[in-house]
Curated annotation (Swiss-Prot):
Entry-linked InterPro entries: YbiA-like_sf (IPR037238)
Protein name: Uncharacterized protein 155L
Family membership noted in the UniProt record: Belongs to the IIV-6 155L family.
Gene3D superfamilies in UniProt: YbiA-like
Length: 255
């Protein structure tokens, strides 16, 4: 009986390219500390973990939804296929979420890890692993999720540094405006269609983002919205890498 129903994974870029950094072993210099299994204490949800690897795989627990979908499948000939398909999707989603949280926590806890990631600027990152979802190295098809998340967080840090260097006095104000925009848009979403707010490029040039945000909040009623003070919002941003909103099309991602 054929037992491998797992969907095919997408093939990624050639890891032999000169602009690609391959994370082979935790003791390699200078990028060994970026390995998923590099031992470095971090704390998530009040618990101590000794690597991102440790945290990621601890999240692969049985799922009630997984069991429910398999048991309730009406066609007995499709049960095995359903089992493998659902198992693959649940594991993929769980691993991706755990990797994100693990890397985010490690960036805060480990300066060496943070600096090593910044030093990869301009290169693709390929994670060598027998797990083809986390990295590559075990067969033709792989996803390299850990490498992709590292690149994502690197982009956020480099962007933040560039904005600070270019506009050091404006950065905090722009971040807080982004926070207010997110709150205002999420609030408005519960009361009316937002299409007209997503077509405001001309208004941005004349009135500016702050006026539009204030109008949204005022229209819904100030008693209906709660916002954090400026310093608290900025403290949260430093952990989330919130990108300031500078054009109307960026508003869509907050909905």
């Amino acid at each position: 009986m054929k037992r491998n129903f797992r969907p095919k994974l997408k093939k990624q870029v050639d890891n032999t390219k000169k602009d690609t950094i391959v994370l082979k072993h935790e003791e390699d210099k200078p990028f060994g500390p970026l390995r998923n299994d590099y031992k470095s204490d971090l704390y998530i949800d009040g618990k101590r973990w000794n690597s991102v690897d440790n945290y990621v795989f601890s999240n692969l627990l049985p799922s009630i939804d997984f069991r429910k979908q398999t048991i309730e499948h009406l066609n007995p000939h499709q049960v095995e296929k359903t089992y493998y398909d659902v198992k693959f999707e649940i594991n993929k989603s769980t691993l991706s979420s755990a990797i994100k949280i693990g890397i985010e926590s490690k960036l805060i806890a480990d300066p060496q890890f943070r600096q090593a990631l910044l030093n990869t600027a301009g290169s693709s990152i390929m994670y060598l692993s027998k797990n083809n979802y986390l990295g590559y190295g075990n067969g033709k098809w792989f996803v390299n999720t850990y490498g992709i998340w590292l690149e994502h967080f690197r982009t956020g840090m480099l962007w933040s540094i560039a904005r600070t260097d270019k506009h050091p006095t404006l950065k905090d104000d722009q971040i807080y405006d982004s926070y207010l925009a997110e709150k205002g848009l999420k609030l408005a979403l519960h009361y009316e269609n937002l299409d007209k707010y997503l077509k405001i490029d001309a208004d941005l040039q004349g009135n500016g983002m702050v006026e539009i945000i204030k109008a949204l909040i005022k229209k819904s009623g100030r008693e209906k919205i709660f916002v954090l003070d400026r310093e608290t919002a900025l403290a949260l941003q430093r952990k989330r890498y919130i990108e300031p909103i500078v054009k109307a099309t960026q508003l869509i991602r907050y909905i």
